[in-house]
């Protein structure tokens, strides 16, 4: 399989935990931007860009489209974590294990997120 990298910017706190091996998953909000960034069309019926706007806040509908195989994850194989926006900022690349929808784990995100569903990017 050809290597395809998903690039994510993270704060120093989470970056340091990833480097230390203490954090094995990263979270992204279920918003139109991330639906369009993580998924691709699997039929001529669904336009991912339009669908992303319609599904804002509707994880039940999004899961239905995924379960019906109408949209599929883009074939990302690795995630590149970057701490900052400069050219010389710290970075680390990890192999992606899976991308799912679920609730985050305590200690791996701000506590206010614990009761909310997110895209969970699990890595090795």
Regions found by a protein language model. Give the residues of each.
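Structured alpha/beta reader/binder surfaces that contact nucleic acids or chromatin modification marks
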Residues: 3-124
């Amino acid at each position: 399989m050809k290597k395809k990298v998903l690039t994510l910017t993270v704060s120093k706190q989470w970056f340091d935990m990833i480097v230390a091996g203490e954090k094995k998953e990263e979270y992204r909000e279920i918003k139109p931007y991330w639906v369009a960034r993580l998924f691709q069309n699997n039929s001529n019926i669904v336009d991912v860009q339009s669908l992303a706007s319609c599904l804002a806040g509707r994880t039940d509908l999004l899961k239905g489209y995924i379960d019906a195989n109408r949209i599929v994850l883009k074939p990302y194989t690795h995630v590149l974590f970057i701490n900052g926006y400069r050219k010389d900022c710290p970075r680390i690349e990890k192999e992606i294990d899976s991308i799912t929808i679920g609730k985050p784990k305590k200690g791996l995100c701000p506590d206010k997120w614990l009761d909310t569903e997110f895209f969970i990017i699990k890595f090795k």
